[in-house]
């Protein structure tokens, strides 16, 4: 009779580490490598070695890509980002998407530098538009950030025909928006599609008639917190 593998040793330790430490988004690897390189080059100098290791650890935490379990309800619209809900209002979607000027329900999430900064699809559907618009790099927690700051908008059409727009907005420190979504892509709810480096904001425009079920000041978990349900 074959023996069962022992629950110890290097492989078991590696499995425990993988289960406890979130993986890193590919966009963060160059930053982590730079920190490790500084530590290696300056290994004879404690302050330089420590600075490099600290920078690498900080970047690993910032670019973490934790696993998430989206809800199974087909009508759910989930948060596209971790952070604090800073505004719930109505506004016309970004003009570059050519969706008209009729106000739609909007939920805004502010991401601090301590939040995970990967973005996830708020719904399942097809990407029908991706538009980038240059702009300012003002503080992302201010109301005018939605209109003035640099942004990338992703428009997703659900199987029932309803549309949801997720807008990545650069901030005072975050000056690099990464969007991996392209027109024609089929996304499942909770799929990772982008990242904003070092602090930012996410605006989610809901279908007309959808009512947000979250509150200002509430913490949102990307891919899991339900913002609203599509009627």
Curated annotation (Swiss-Prot):
It catalyses: a 1,2-diacyl-sn-glycero-3-phospho-L-serine + H(+) = a 1,2-diacyl-sn-glycero-3-phosphoethanolamine + CO2. Binds 1 pyruvoyl group covalently per subunit. One of its GO terms (cellular component) is plasma membrane. The record marks 199-200 as: Cleavage (non-hydrolytic). Pathway: Phospholipid metabolism; phosphatidylethanolamine biosynthesis; phosphatidylethanolamine from CDP-diacylglycerol: step 2/2. Its main location: membrane. It is found in: Cell membrane. The modification Pyruvic acid (Ser) is found at residue 200. GO terms for biological process: phosphatidylethanolamine biosynthetic process. GO terms for molecular function: phosphatidylserine decarboxylase activity. Is synthesized initially as an inactive proenzyme. Formation of the active enzyme involves a self-maturation process in which the active site pyruvoyl group is generated from an internal serine residue via an autocatalytic post-translational modification. Two non-identical subunits are generated from the proenzyme in this reaction, and the pyruvate is formed at the N-terminus of the alpha chain, which is derived from the carboxyl end of the proenzyme. It is an enzyme of class 4 (lyase). The active site is at residue 200. The keyword Lipid metabolism applies. It is a peripheral membrane protein. Keywords: Cell membrane, Decarboxylase, Lipid biosynthesis, Lipid metabolism, Lyase, Membrane, Phospholipid biosynthesis, Phospholipid metabolism, Pyruvate, Zymogen. Heterodimer of a large membrane-associated beta subunit and a small pyruvoyl-containing alpha subunit. Belongs to the phosphatidylserine decarboxylase family. PSD-A subfamily. This is Phosphatidylserine decarboxylase proenzyme. The lineage of its organism: Bacteria, Bacillati, Actinomycetota, Actinomycetes, Mycobacteriales.
């Amino acid at each position: 009779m074959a023996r069962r593998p022992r629950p110890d040793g290097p492989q078991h330790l590696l499995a425990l580490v993988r289960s406890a430490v979130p993986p890193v988004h590919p966009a963060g690897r160059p930053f982590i490598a730079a920190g490790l390189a500084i530590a290696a080059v300056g290994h004879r100098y404690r302050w330089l070695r420590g600075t490099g290791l600290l920078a690498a650890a900080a970047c690993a935490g910032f670019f973490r890509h934790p696993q998430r379990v989206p809800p199974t309800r087909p009508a759910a619209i989930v948060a596209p980002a971790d952070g604090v809900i800073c505004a719930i209002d109505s506004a016309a979607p970004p003009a570059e998407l050519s969706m008209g000027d009729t106000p739609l329900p909007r939920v805004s999430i502010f991401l601090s530098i301590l939040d995970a900064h990967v973005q996830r699809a708020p719904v399942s559907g097809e990407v029908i538009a991706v538009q980038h618009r240059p702009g300012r790099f003002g503080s992302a927690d201010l109301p005018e950030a939605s209109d003035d700051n640099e942004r990338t908008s992703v428009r997703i059409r659900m199987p029932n025909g309803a549309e949801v727009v997720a807008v990545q907005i650069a901030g005072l420190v975050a000056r690099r928006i990464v969007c991996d979504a392209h027109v024609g892509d089929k996304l499942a709810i909770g799929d990772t599609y982008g990242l904003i480096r070092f602090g930012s904001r996410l605006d989610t425009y809901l279908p007309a008639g959808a009512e947000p079920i979250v509150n200002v000041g509430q913490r949102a978990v990307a891919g899991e917190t339900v913002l609203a349900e599509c009627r």
